[in-house]
């Protein structure tokens, strides 16, 4: 997955001068370190966005789909970024709604995202290239969409961090697939469209002559 995402969200100059890609998916967080246009290190960690959702579900006593919606719509990776507002959560089976402060939600989310980023920091250091990442870190995947994730990453990793959105598409459903959660899929499409890949498809097209029945 890091290879697929890299084609969609990384600039070629970033891969040349050194960059770490952190793809926070649902079930895993994929890490890849690039330098001199070469993948120097990869790792897959079984702590990702679903763990954040589970923390919210257990912490607030809500259903899983409610927890996912709360994470995506109101979540923050840093408690100080959460506005002083309350969220009304519909009660289960007709019960009275719950009201939860956004700062409370952020306090549930932050420790898990910190854990993900701290593990990523260990893997980046393990690569031996942590001092050579002039382009810093690029975060992608659905888990990176939680507000403040890039800022928290910069703080924990001690380097520049940005959210990577799929690029390289010039027509069609560009807006629809520019979300980081589509990075891997878009990257694989772009990889397949590279000039050196055209013509390598195993499928055959037979041209029918006009005289053929």
Per-region residue spans from a language model:
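Helical "lid/coupling" subdomains associated with nucleotide-phosphate turnover
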Residues: 2-21, 32-213
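Short acidic, Gly/Ser-rich segments with clustered Asp/Glu that frequently serve as metal-coordination loops
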Residues: 25-30
